[in-house]
Every structure is written in structure tokens, then in C-alpha cells.
Amino acid sequence: MSSQGSPSVALSTTTVSSVAVQAGDSKIVIAVIKCGKWVQLQLAESQPNLLEIGSSQDETKKLLHDHELLLAKLKALEDRVWELLQEADKTAEENKDQSQVYDAMAETLGEAWAALVSMLERRTELLRLTSEFFENALEFAIKIDQAEDFLQNTHEFESAESLKSLLQLHEHHTKELLERSLALLNKSQQLTDFIEKFKCEGPNVNPELTQGAHSSCLKVDRLLELLQDRRRQLDKYLKQQWQELSQVLQICQWDQQENQVTCWFQKTIRNLQEQSLGSSLSDNEDRIHKQEELIIKAKEWNSAVEKLKSEALRILLSKDYVEKEHLQLSHQKLSQLQEEFGQLMVERNTWLKKANEFFNSANKAFDVLGRVEAYLKLLKSEGLSLAVLAVRHEELHRKIKDCTTDALQKGQTLISQVDSCSSQVSGIHEMMGCIKRRVDHLTEQCSAHKEYALKKQQLTASVEGYLRKVEMSIQKISPVLSNAMDVGSTRSESEKILNKYLELDIQAKETSHELEAAAKTMMEKNEFVSDEMVSLSSKARWLAEELNLFGQSIDYRSQVLQTYVAFLKSSEEVEMQFQSLKEFYETEIPQKEQDDAKAKHCSDSAEKQWQLFLKKSFITQDLGLEFLNLINMAKENEILDVKNEVYLMKNTMENQKAEREELSLLRLAWQLKATESKPGKQQWAAFKEQLKKTSHNLKLLQEALMPVSALDLGGSLQFILDLRQKWNDMKPQFQQLNDEVQYIMKESEELTGRGAPVKEKSQQLKDLIHFHQKQKERIQDYEDILYKVVQFHQVKEELGRLIKSRELEFVEQPKELGDAHDVQIHLRCSQEKQARVDHLHRLALSLGVDIISSVQRPHCSNVSAKNLQQQLELLEEDSMKWRAKAEEYGRTLSRSVEYCAMRDEINELKDSFKDIKKKFNNLKFNYTKKNEKSRNLKALKYQIQQVDMYAEKMQALKRKMEKVSNKTSDSFLNYPSDKVNVLLEVMKDLQKHVDDFDKVVTDYKKNLDLTEHFQEVIEECHFWYEDASATVVRVGKYSTECKTKEAVKILHQQFNKFIAPSVPQQEERIQEATDLAQHLYGLEEGQKYIEKIVTKHKEVLESVTELCESLTELEEKLKQGDVLKMNPNLEDFHYDYIDLLKEPAKNKQTIFNEERNKGQVQVADLLGINGTGEERLPQDLKVSTDKEGGVQDLLLPEDMLSGEEYECVSPDDISLPPLPGSPESPLAPSDMEVEEPVSSSLSLHISSYGVQAGTSSPGDAQESVLPPPVAFADACNDKRETFSSHFERPYLQFKAEPPLTSRGFVEKSTALHRISAEHPESMMSEVHERALQQHPQAQGGLLETREKMHADNNFTKTQDRLHASSDAFSGLRFQSGTSRGYQRQMVPREEIKSTSAKSSVVSLADQAPNFSRLLSNVTVMEGSPVTLEVEVTGFPEPTLTWYKKGQKLSADGHLQVLHKETRHSVFIPKVCKADAGLYVARAQNSSGALSSNVILHVTGNCRLPITRVNWITLCVVYVSVSLMYWLLTQ
């Protein structure tokens, strides 16, 4: 059926029927609604709502199940619906007129049913979709639970792999969570979209559906939000744990990589440490190749290390990572390992290269050793001598050493560098062992040079041993022979002396044997020729000559002594024989004939004794003559004075001669008695026989004298000695003949008396007597001539021997380059020989002349003296020639001595120069190696002193050299030796070196002087910086207290007056320092030295600029009355400048109240000194008339501003030294003009030692004493000294309470106080100049102190200062009107003038007392300690006495009077009210007296501090009044 149209009018809707379907908890009610011709089905009720989805999966499943049952039941009614529709069709067919209605109803009913079924099916789909959603949500929740369990469970991992698995699980859970979340989101979106679509289907929107849709969507959203919250939270924890695990994994992986890299490095390092450098060249080259490959591989590992290090650095720099300490340690370990590996690689490369060089050298060495070995085999076959073989072997040994030294040295160096016990050098050890074994083998084969050297050494040692023994023996003999010999006064003494000389002779002969053995050894081993052997040979010759001289002296002395002893002994024997024979002849009676046999025996015995006596007597006579001859030939000083012995000997010889004659007469008488008993005829017959025999013997004697008469006096000595020996043998015969003649003469006389015919024999007897007398005279003449001839020839022979030895010396040139002592000895020996030769010459000539004169006698006419005369003439001629040669030789030796002495002097100069140069270089080196801190000005000055000392030494050396040079040129003008040129060359070379070194010393000294000047300039710069900085700080601090524009303006002007002229001077100093630094250290290094100065200068200029700007700004602000706002800024400015001074005082101790009190005393001293003058106002700055009213009373001229007007003075800052003319200083520079009168009523009478505070009445007077100008200069300089010393010395720390300031806060004693509490020189320069102009006598002390300060910045003084607080100077006030000025008590000007005059004329030996530190008024709190100190100088040392209120002070339990050097003080540990009053220190000596006064004020402890508000209020009031006054006066 179908509907043809819709009614045109509104039709009513009627519920035809309703159908209820229920399945479980689900129930729907369907209403059949009719509206006109339409019939529709309407869901009237649904439980639950069609869009209700349930709260859980189970509930949804139940809803789905019930809904499916419901739908099944509903579908079961579908047939009935279709049946109804069929019935409707039938009815429509039956009712044609209603067919249209029925068709419409059928159509709408079918559509409604289909729609209803579709709706219910959609619900089924919704529930299924919801079920799927809840299923996904459940899976998502389960996954979340699993992930939570995963997070909550503790996971252990043993390796990075397990950690990776854990991270994978993390990723897996995260991924699944995301997947489940995404699926759930998609499903929820799908479900939500489905609900929204379901809700909006149909022409009308059902509110219930809308509400159900909203409820279902809300459930979905809540569940989804809950799960997503859990997921997000879980995801956060998962991410956090994953991040942590990732970090751990990253660190683990880093550790793994680090372990891998470390293992590789450690393994490689072990290999590098253990691997050998090779055992051969090829092995070494292979290892070098492997090393190159390792270098390439190491680059890769190093890149890995760098990546690890960068990763580690990234991790360390990251804030998210934990446990960084392990990583940091590993990073450091890895860096160290890499560094160690790099060092080992470098070392390994170096060692491999050195090993390669070693093996190359070893191969070259083996090649050379092979050639040496072949050459050694060739030498063995040649059979060379030891000397030649030694030379060849020595060359080979040198070649062996040269070729192996390089290899062994390289190997040893390599072993020492690596490690001698390391396995790396095992191959080096083996190769070196091979080389050494090969060298040892070849060295054993080529040992001829060692054998040769050993033998030569043995020979040298042997010869040296011989010569040493010879020298020792000569040293023992020399002292004995150097003294003259004493022959002794007795025989025993002479025998002792003889034995001593015989021992010396034996010793000399043994020494001679030693010397001969040495000479023989050198002669036999002449193949071992060397410089040492030549020297020993020369030494042996000298020793032989000296020993020869000693031997000759010993032989001569021994001969003299032997002759003398033999003479004495023989004389004694002769005397004994004489006495025996004399007794015999006097007492013995000749026997008669019956005793012929006995008489004959007695006569024969007496005759034998007589003959022995004659022989011994003549021998004694010969010994005496020989002794006298030896004495005549003795050298000068050879024998002690023997005049007495000679005299005794001659007497003995004369006595023996007389004894012979006496005994001869006794014998003759005895013989005559013996013949008396014979008959006359028998006597006559015997007489004739005796006469005949005697005549015959005389003829024989004449024949025996013929050889002597024909003697050639110029013959040989041996012939003459033989002749003399024969003559001596004939002397007994001469005596016998003489006795026979005497006997004949006596017997003839007796026979004549008996009547015998003697007359017939008288002629014969006369002839016999005459002939005998003639022969006797001839014998005497011949004996004299023979004795002199023998003596002459002996002297001549000795002279010839000496001349021959001297000629050999003349041929040899003296050792000009020998030791001066040896040459001196040689000269002395030569002179002794010369004197000996001259003596022998004179003796020979004297003997020759005597002999020739003796020959002139008549009995000697046959003796030939012609040859002797020729010999004398030749001897005279040779003597002259030889003397000339000897003199020339002596001059040569003298020149040699001079040459050696000059050479020694030059060598001494060279040694002195070397010593000076060495010590100077050591001085330079020791100074150079000092650090910059040690090379301070003091060390530099000491270095300059040392250099000056060496410069003086050099000048002294040059003077000595000049003297030696002049002496050389004067002494060796005609010296023929070329050695003089050598000396001159040496002298010239030494002069050149000395000049060069003198230039070095001079340049070094100039350099040191420049360095000293440079350091002084630097110190002056630093001093200016400190001065300027302190001034900036002080002015900045003063500016914080300034309350008026005029005060700031004056302060600014005063500051400019101080700083403006000093800046150009400082820049000149900097420029000078720059030039000096560049000159001393070069451009770049010099710039480094000067950078700090320039930087500091800029900082100071910047601080000055900032200060000026601040002062200008402050002045502008004060114009606008903006004082209160500026003060804090200025205080900040003030403390900014404190920082400027902290750098130079960085390491210094802080200064406590004692330092500040010290500063107060110093300022009080300055005020006391300056305040005694009369003030004079400049004419252009006078204050005008009463027009200015009250301001007139407050303003002073620019150069002399009063403290009352200038409200800048703080009780804390009263210790600061004021600038010249600054607001704090109550004195102008013109105040030094003491003699000027008071110029204006505005002049302020300011106390010499302090200003009374606050409420001081006019009656409270301040006492003052004007010190002499020298004291003023000393005081000023004292401030400078202590200023500089503050930066140089540490301070003792004291416990002190800082005083309360007028601004209500405690001022700490910082470095600012240390600097500002002193008085720099530059800040008082103008005052100093004016003071010196007015008082020239002060200039010397001031300059002296200034120089002392600049010379030694370390000078300090004892810090015994006043223990007083600064409350005494709580402000500076001046009363107006007639009571404005403070009263002063001053020393009369006459006393001042007299003191000054005395000071100016007293010399150093007589100086009047002078206070270099004056007393100053002090205000202290009761119970505080205080020290009143004064320093006095003068000569003689002044005695200082303390007075209090006119009474002399002495030490007691309450106070102490102290004295140390020039400082005198009174120390009161606890001050009480009774201690207040006037104290006077009076110094007196023989040149004058001087006093200094101080007033001690004692205040109570209850004084309230002046707060900052009071000052500010006062300032505001003051400015307000000033402005009102200005407005009113306009």
C-alpha cells in the first residue's frame, strides 16, 4: 500500500494499540499510532535506554544478551505484522474506496516496523561495539597493570645484553600501551561517533536518547580518561625508567667500549713494553714495519677513544645522568691510558729508530772487525818487531775501538733509556754481547801495544824507581855536602868524620850504581822511546852530573880526611919510634967484643928501628905535604877554617925534622961509643973503609939525581909522580948518606985525637964533605921543585877535567823551558864550578911561577922549564878564552832564569785571569738563575758591588800585566832565543783575552747599573701609584664628609694641584722605564716588564678621572642641595677606591688601633710642626667685608681652609696626613714662613700638637714647641719611611677595640688605614720645598733621609706608638669673636734662632740635640694604655729627662720610663685622671739643650658617640641657614 497524499489539514494522532516486549532486564513498549491515513510504530518505552551502554563489559554483555533476546522476540512478531499488512491489502482490495488509506497505512506501518527493527538492530550493534570497547579497555587496563607490575618489579641485569632486553621490554610495553591506547581511542571514537549518529537519526530527536547518549559518552570518556591517566602516569614512569636504563645502558655500553678499548690499549701497552726491539737489523726493520701498521691501527682506536671521551664529556656535562663519578674516573683512566699509550708509542718509535741506528752501527762495526781480523792474520805472518807490531796493533785497537764505540754507546744509551732488565732490549744485549766478545777476541790478538806499553811502563817504573832512589840518596847527601867540612881537632873526631864520609862515599857509589843501572836499562831498551823516557833520560843526566859533583866532593873530602888521619896516626907512630930510639940511644951502652953476637944483634935491631923511623918519618912528611896541597886545592867554603890544623901540621913536620936530626946525632954518638973499644988500627981501617964506601955512595947518589936534574917540568904527571915516588924511596938513603958523612966527620976527629994518620985522608975527607954539602943542597932544591911540579900538574889535571866538563855544558844549550828552580840550581852549580876553575887557574899560575923561579937556582940549571913556560902561557890564554865562554854561558843561564821567571809570572797572570773569569762567570750564573723575586734591588746592589770588586781585580791584573810586559820588553831585547817571541805571543794573547773580558765586565756592570736605575724608576713609579692611590682614596673619603660646594671645589682644586704636575713626571718615568726595559731585555721582553706599570698607570688615571668626575658631580649636586642623596654614592665611591689599594697590600696583615694611633701621633707631629708658624693670607684670596656675614666667618682662602668651615673632618680620619692646603690641613704652604708677622684678623691660631674638641673653653691652652727645621724634615721623612715600610714588613697582631666614629659605625683597620695613615713624600712636596727655602740647614737631613728611603725600602722602626683612641679628635671647631683663636705657648724665637744657628754650625763631631720625632698632644680614655715617645739625636749622645708638671719623672709601679737607642718613651699601662697634664721631654748635651711638650688629656668611659644623624642634621641646618642668608643678602 501506498499513500496518495497527506491531508491538507492537521489530523489527530491516536494510539491504536501498544505492544510490550521484555527479555530479562530489557523491556520495550511499542505503540501503534495512527494519524489520518498514516499508521506508524513508535517506541514508547525502552528499558534501559536505547543508547545506554552499561558501566562495564559484563553489564554490556548482559544488556546485549537481553537485547538480543528482546530483538528475537520482536522479530518473532514480524510475521504477524506482515500478516496484518496482508490483511490490510485484502481489506484495501475489498474496499476500493479506502484502498488509498489502507495502502498508506500499510506503507507507513511497514516502514515503521523496518525502522523499529533497524533501531533495535542498531542498538545491538551499539552494544556489541560497546562490548568491544570494554574489551579493548580491559585489555588496555590489563596491559597497564602488566606495565605497572613491570615497573614495580626489581629487574636485575648482568650485562648490557640483559639491559638491552630490559629496554626492549620497556619499548614493548610502551608500544603495546600505545597500541592499546590507540585501539581504545579509536574504539571510543567509533563508539562515540556511533552514539552521536544513533542519537541524531530520525526526524525528531528524542530527549531520552540524547540523555542516554550523553550518559554513555560520559561513561566512555571517564573510562577512557581514567585509563589514559594511568597510561600517561605509567608512560611517564616508563619513560623515566627507560631513560635511566638507557643512561645505564649507555654507560654500560660506554664501559664495554671503554673496557674493549682499555683491553686493547693495555694489551698493546704490554706488548709495547715487552716486545723486543729486535735482535738484528732485519728483525728490527720488521718490527718498525709492524710499528707503522700499529700506528695506523692506533689512529682508529684513538678516534674511538676520542668518541668515548666526547661521549663521556657529554654525559658528564648532562644533568640527567647519575653515577658520574665512576664515569669521571673511567674517563680520567682512559685519558691517562691514552696518554701512556701515546708516550709508549712515541718512545717505541724513538727506541726502534735508535735500535735501527744501533744495528746499522753494529753491522758496520762487524764489517770493520772482519777486516781487522784479516789484517791481524797478515801481521802474524810478517814477523815484525815488538815496537813496529805495537804501533800496528795500537792502530788496529784504535780502529776497533772507533768502529765499536758508536754502536756500544748507542746500545748502552738505549738500554739505559729503556730499562736494562726489560725484555725489549734483550736483542740489544745479545748484539752488544756479540760485539764485545768479538772485540775481546780481537783485542786479545792485537795485544802487542799493551805488551809494549806494559814493558815501557815497567821500564819507566824501573827507571823512575832507580831515579827515585838516586833522588832520595842525593837528598840525604846534599845536606851534608852543603856544609863546610870540619877536619876535626883530634884523631878520633877526624876518624868519625872520615867514617861518615866513607859511608857517604859508599852510599854515593851505590847511588851511582843505581844511576848506571837506570842508564843501562834505558840504553838496552832504546826501542821504548817516548817523551817520558826522554824526560827521564834528561833527568838521569842531571842527576848523574849532580851525583858526580857530590862524588867528587866526597872523594876530595875523604882524601883530605884520610890524609889528615893518616898523618896524625903516622905522627903518633913516629913519635913513639922516636921516643923508643931516643931512649935506646941514650940508655943503651954498646957491648964489648966478647959479646959481639949480642952487640951485633942489638946494633942490627937498632938499625932496623932507625930505618923504620926514617921511612915512617918521611911518609908522615909526605902526608903532611899532600894534606897541605889538598887544602890549597880546596873550593871556597869546602872546608872550615883549618889554619890551626895547618899550623899544627907544619909544627909537627918541623918537630919531626928536628927529631930526625936529634936522633941522628944520638945514633952517631952511640955508634962512636961502640967503636971506642976497638983498637986504633982496627978503627983506622974501618974509617978508611967507611970513607971509601961513603964516597962511592955519594957518587951513586949523584948518578941517581941525574934523572931529576934532567927533568922536563912540562912533562907528564905520571912520569913526575913516578919520579917523586922514587925520590921518596930514596929519602932514607939520603938520610943514611948524611948520617954516614956525619959519622966519618966525627970519627975523623976522634981518630985525630988518638994520633991516627988522618991527614992523609984529609983532602979526601974535605972533598967528601964538600960533595955531600953540594948534593944536600941539590936534593933540597930538587925536592922543592918536584913537590911544586907535582902539585902544579895535579892542579892542571883537575883544571883540565873541570874545563872539559864545562865545555860539554857549553855545547849543550840550557833548558830554557825547564823549571825555574832547576835552571836556578844549574846556574848556581855553574857559578860554583866557575869559582872552582878560577881558583885552580890562580893556583896553577902561582905554582908555575914559583917553579920557574925555583929553576933559576944554580943547582937546577939542568932542569928544563921551557915546556912549563909554554904550558903556563897556554893556560893563561885558555883561561881568558874559557872565562869569556863561562861568562857568556852564565849570562845565558841568567837569561834562562829570567825567562823562566817571566814565563812563570805570565802563567800566574793567566791563572789569575782564569780564576777571576771563572768566579765572575759563576757570579753571573748564580745571579741569572735567581727568580725575579730574588733579584730585588738589594740583591742587585750587592751584585753591583761584587762586579765592582771584579772590575778592580781586573784593573789590578792589567797593571800587573803592564809591568810584566814592560819587564819582558826590557829584559829580552837581545835575547837570541825564539822563545821570547812565544812569550810575547802568549802575553799578547792574554792581553787580548783580558781586554775582551774587561769589556764584558764593563758591559755587564753598565747593564747592572741600567737595571738598578730601571728598578729604581719602577719603584718610583710604584711609589707614585701608591701615593696617588692613597690620595685618591683619602680625597674620596674626604669628599663624603663635604657639605658645601665651596669645600668640594677647594678639595678638587687641591687635588688637581697635587695630581696635575705629577702625572707628566710619572709618564716621563714610564717612558724612561720603557726605554730602559727595551734596551735591557729587548723589544718583546721589555714590553712584558713594562705592561704592569702601564696597566697600573691607566688604572690610577682612570681612578683620578673618576674621582674628578665624582667631585664635579658632587659639586653640581651640592649646588642643588642634593646632599643626602649623594652621600651614599660617594661612600660607595670611597670604598671602590679602597679596592684600588688592596692589590699592593694583598698579603699584608691588617693594622689595628695601635697603627691608627701611630698615624694620629704622626699627624699631630706634623700639625705641631706646621702650626707654629705665623699664617699669611694671599692678597688675591682675602675674604671680603661684613657683606658676607656669617659665611665670612666660615670661609677661608683656598690654600688655608679652616676646620670649622670645612665639615669634612672625621674623628676616624684625623690620623690621615692632610694634603698641602687640603680641607683637613689647617695650614697653608706659607705657614712655613715663621718670621712673617700676622697678616689678618682672620688668621687662625691653631695648636701645635692638636685641636681641642667640642666644648673646649678658651682657657684650655695648648702648649707647643717649634722644632728646628731639621726636625721638621726628619718628621716629614719619617712619614715617608714608615709609608714605604708598611708595604715591606709584617705586623704583629694586637687585640684592640675600634673606636666609635662620629658617623655611627665602626671603622675597620684595613689596608686603607695602613696607607692613608702615613705621609708620602709627594703629598708634602710643596711644604718641603718651602721649608727648605726658608731653612737651608734642613735640606741636608731631608735629602739624606730621602736617599735613605729610596735606597732601602725595607728600613723599619719600632712600632711603639701611642695606645690612644681617636676620640680626642671628634671634630675641629673654631670659636667666633675674640675667643675664636686657641691660645698657644711657644718657645721664644730667640731660642729657636739660637737652636737653628747652633744646628747649622755644629759639625758632625759636635751636634746639638735634635728631635727627629716630636711629642704630640694625646687624649685617651681612662684605663687605656698610652705611650709618649720622642726620638732625639745629637753628638755627644744627649741625655733626656722627663718632667710632669715641673717634677722629674722616674719609673715606678704605675709607669715605665724606657730608652732604646735614640728613642725615649714613657709608657703608662692604665691611664687614670691623675696622669693628665703637661709632660716635657728635655734633651741636653755639651752642645745645647732642647725641649718638647705634650698635654695628656684623660676622658671618662661614658662619652656618647656622635651619630651620623647629628652630622647630617647639622649639615642640613648649615645648608639651610646658608641658603637663607644668601637669599636675604640678595
Curated annotation (Swiss-Prot):
Residues 642-706, 758-783, 861-970 form a coiled coil. Keywords: Coiled coil, Cytoplasm, Cytoskeleton, Immunoglobulin domain, Phosphoprotein, Ubl conjugation. One of its GO terms (biological process) is cerebral cortex radially oriented cell migration. Ubiquitinated and degradated by the CDC20-APC/C pathway. During brain development, CDC20-APC/C complex degrades CCDC141 after centrosome translocation into the dilated area. CCDC141 is restabilized in the dilation until the centrosome enters the dilation, at which point it is once again immediately destabilized by CDC20-APC/C complex. The oscillatory regulation of CCDC141 protein is needed for proper cortical migration. Phosphorylation at Thr-91 by PLK1 affects CCDC141 degradation. It is found in: Cytoplasm; Cytoplasm, Cytoskeleton, Microtubule organizing center, Centrosome. GO terms for cellular component: centrosome; cytoplasm. The modification Phosphothreonine is found at residue 91. It holds the Pfam family Spectrin. Residues 1409-1530 form the Ig-like domain. This is Coiled-coil domain-containing protein 141. It comes from Homo sapiens. The gene is CCDC141.
